[in-house]
Amino acid sequence: MKLLRLTILMACLLVPQLLIAQTSDSAQMDVAQGETTLVESGVEAAQPQVQSEIIKTGYNFGPLPAVAFDADKGLQLGAILNIYDFGDGSRYPNTRQNWYFEASFFTKGSQLFVVSYDNNFSIPSVRFCSTFTLTNDKAMDFYGFNGYMSYYDHAKVKAGKDKGNHEQFIYTPKYRVNRLAVLFKTDFIGNIWDNKFFWEAGYHLNYFKMGYKNQQALNYAKINKNKAEDKQFPSDPTAENYEKPIFDLYREWGIISDDEAWGGLTSSVRLGLLFDTRDKEAAPSRGIWAEAHLMLAPRWLGTTHPSYRYSVTFRQYVPIVKNDVLTFAYRLNYEGTFGDKAPYYILPYITTVGPNYDRDGMGGYRTIRGMMRDRVQGLDMASYNVELRWRFVKFQLWKQNIAFGLNIFSDGTMVTKNYDMSFRGSEESRAAYDEYMALSGNRTSDRPHITVGAGLRFIMNQNFIVAFEYGLPISRFSSDPFIKNQDGNGAFYINTGYLF
């Protein structure tokens, strides 16, 4: 049955794209062109290829159903439209401009809407990117702050999911919170030197609505809707099996202040520098992609809770076997905060400038594969991703360039500057706080969270990439009782693109 479901998912993802992805003009020729960079004057073509490949030109329309799976969000159902403008083909596999539209619904209660535009030609030597996203999570993961300093009661969660015990309460809402996030951004990237060194500047406007009616973490009526009575989450605080969500406990203990608890507006300017020598963007096989940027969100820009942060990321792609056959790739990232204060609701995000938009982290498909979503949050966080990518077959089908690839990987992260978790609540809550902190061994710092895994990818025209990956946290095998199973049991993903 699982094999049948996987086959149906693959068919829904791949067949529509193969049938519809036709361009206004395509030519078959030997690819032997120069290095690719970001802006128009530098974006030409990929590294030399020895085999004949179809060069895509004109417009390529890719409507397809959004059918995917994420262990953190559940089954994804929706629709996606990609529009690629390859121009005269001289940039292939990079585009002249492209549009991305998505409306997705997840079986665990999330909705995602995305409108994105990326332009490489309108402004000479400047790339222009603009994105609007709306994410509605009626039960978003929230495990607390500072990684292993916040204890995850995996044993009770496992017991609560025991379908054979109808008297056992379901425990997962303890680690959930309602969140609405609306993000808008416009970024510019311009050439400084030789189409390899660039400046970055952008404006980002983000709105976060946390919790339910400024009263509690969750809307229990919504998450219990259509559930059998014995499967409903306890919502009455006087019930014997009721468990107050961590979010509500953090408010009681003063870890999350009443001023910040229900979210706010973040209006920020981002400024940065970028160095990019990748041969192509969607699936690079050689080059360096490094950037550093500041996020400045002062009150005078309209920000509810001011913050000043920075991000440094270094990525490198090393060809072991040429022509995209075998590539070693890695990414190092550091997300930091100036000072000792930042609103808690911005901490999960891995910040970007350019065509991508901010992603939830650390934990999940786009950050640390195999670890629970948002498991690690702190004022400063360091992370790494290492991959070995093998493209084991290439061919042409229905005038499209097709390839399949395998990869093995390891991801890791840890908090390097703690979010303040000191007790600031009323004394009647002190005992519960002390008991909670003791569960993690009264730890005062985090340790590395590491995962390993492997995946398979379907690649079409170097840009459309479908990924099947499984990640496993090594904490499952730890002998330390304060570490074992704290990052989850592993996760399987069906999604698009490479992680980086």
Regions found by a protein language model. Name each.
Residues 458, 486-500:
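Outer-membrane beta-barrel "beta-signal"
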